[in-house]
Amino acid sequence: MTNTNRRTITVYGATGAQGGPVVRSLLKNNAFKVRAITRKPESEAAKALADLGAEIVQGDGWKKEQMVAAFSGSWAAFVNTNSDDPCFWDANHPTEFDLGKIIIDGIIQAGTVKHLVYSSFVDTSSFTNGQAIIEAADEKSKIERYAASSGHFDTVCPLYQGWYMDVFRGQEYAHALGGFPYFEDEDKFRTLRLPRWGTHTDMPLPWISLEDDFGDIVHGIFLTPEDYNGRVVPTVSDIRTYPEMIDAFQSGMPSLFWFLVCRLTSVHALATGQKARYIPVTDWEAHFGDSHHGKESLAIFKFGKFTNGKYFGDEPISTDISATLKAKAAEAQGKDPSDRKLITLVEWFEKHVAPLL
């Protein structure tokens, strides 16, 4: 396909945890030109995307005129607003919806974007009749509805994110989890300490690998955006309860045996072979504390308890849509059929955590 026929997809939040994988996946498809919006074009993350072939554009989401310029000439857009931005912690500061509205208004004024994929979430206030509210989720849902009701776009596709597998890559975060997956406790276990997900028993959670699958899932939507207009796409790589996730981490052969086998044969052990356990937390308030992130986490688990683990609300927890989209994107990238499947938690731990243990 010639450069004049390539369609431009612009990514807002391009150096973030979601936007980065989207840019990297789309760049592997010659049918698309990829424009990456960032507040800091001089950052190492932005330079890395430029080295891969992305067009880097400076843009501040709070400045509408910059959004108009950044999205001008684009055929489609992926947008994720950062709910963890400390500016939203100030009750006197504009909200995440205010930011999202400026971005959407800028896209509309740019005049060329036909297809929008927005990283949204469940309207928890409506779903629970105000009984278990996650403020960040409601802000995202409100932005989604604003975009859809504008009447400007040919298609608007809302994404619901699974729980990030990627949080287990950071050793600094492990201490907040009880040590899992990097640090042993006094009993020589790598212990995960979190509240139970669900009302009375451990309910399954949808897990997503941002680096391995998320970008390809979004890529797949842009191949046939009309198929996903107004349709929630849950991004899910694997589905497991916390105890099942611990099993995935532990699976494999003991470390010494794994070391010898991998060097003497072509067999590779899966995951880590390390001892781990899950201990449900009962005193939620004491566990999470009164920090902003602690209160946000508490709200999420209260939602899980109230809904008996309905993480996506009325949307089913399934890998079906994600698997279809991943396969389509991989085919468009020219990947081998064996490299078109979603990653499992076992495979993810083996790939991303085992080398660090």
UniProtKB/Swiss-Prot annotation:
It is an enzyme of class 1 (oxidoreductase). The keyword NADP applies. GO terms for molecular function: oxidoreductase activity. Pfam families: NmrA (PF05368). InterPro entries: NAD(P)-bd_dom_sf (IPR036291), NmrA-like (IPR008030), NmrA-like_oxidored (IPR051164). Keywords: Alkaloid metabolism, NADP, Oxidoreductase. NmrA-like family domain-containing oxidoreductase; part of the gene cluster that mediates the biosynthesis of notoamide, a fungal indole alkaloid that belongs to a family of natural products containing a characteristic bicyclo[2.2.2]diazaoctane core. The first step of notoamide biosynthesis involves coupling of L-proline and L-tryptophan by the bimodular NRPS notE', to produce cyclo-L-tryptophan-L-proline called brevianamide F. The keyword NADP applies. It comes from Aspergillus versicolor. This is NmrA-like family domain-containing oxidoreductase notA'. Belongs to the NmrA-type oxidoreductase family. The lineage of its organism: Eukaryota, Fungi, Dikarya, Ascomycota, Pezizomycotina. One of its GO terms (cellular component) is nucleus. One of its GO terms (biological process) is alkaloid metabolic process. NADP(+) binds at residues 13-18, 39-43, 60-61, 81-83, 140, 164-167. The gene is notA'. Its EC number is 1.-.-.-.
